[in-house]
């Protein structure tokens, strides 16, 4: 990766890790702080979950965060990223162990992609996608 991408990852990954752990503990606000408030923005999730526009995305994440609790493990595994000018993306897997919908010891691996844009000197997520990783889908009775 080049210096522009390295600088992007240095700025984004630590803050993103903390925000995702908070999300898995039922608090969507740190995650939302990383997202843009400017249109267009969207989220596309598994099973047809789609949110378009800032208000819809925020409502969706606040609702989903309430389904998580007790994050005993969370790891973001970066697969690929790139940054040029005011645009960037990241692709990876989010590995989670904790409670989901009241089920303790839930293990999840989600494949996630995020598209970022620089706004007022900070990277903000403009679009995201997440679904159950293909190998986890085959081995899970809940997927």
Model-identified regions with their sequence ranges:
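A beta-strand edge to alpha-helix "cap/lid" segment located at domain peripheries
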Residues: 1-36, 41-143
